[in-house]
Amino acid sequence: MKICIILNGEIKNYDYINSVILKGSYDYIICSDGGANHAYSMNIVPDYIIGDLDSVNGNIIEYYKSKKVKFEKFPTKKDETDTELCIELSDKLKAKEIHLIGALGGRIDHTIANINLLYYIRKRGITPKIISEKEEIYIAMDEEITIYGEIGDIISILPIKNDAKGVTLNNLEYPLED
């Protein structure tokens, strides 16, 4: 089960992101509150819109209601972010993979929080990824991952919680053996 969550962060190239979503073969598309504005701009009809709905344009809410999109409205004052609520729903839907779109840009605190959500998702046993026009962000925890790219692509490996151990990088300009 593969789920796309569209957030309210920065999306500058709607054509590119729309093609990523269409090629993603997602089982569900969920909008985290204002992410519905982005979905609307890309002519995407999500399966769910979740949050306090304080960032969604009113006419977009009405449009998606007419399209029978499922809404889950929550109070503004709550313990979880709108995106955490989307992740909880994804978990209930038995997601094996979650891709976050629109998770970067805008407020730096939101960007950092969204990157930290990768760890939160991974701890649930779900494989997460952030996708933007410029980068893809993964998290690896005691596992092997394969990243495909082209000559000239930039790859950064950053330890988040502790020192990275057992890291081997092959077929790169700067290979690494633990």
Please annotate each region the language model reported.
Residues M1-Y64:
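N-terminal beta-strand-loop-alpha-helix module at the start
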Residues K70-K92:
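Short phosphate-binding loop-to-helix
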Residues E135, M141-D178:
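Long, charged alpha-helical interface segments
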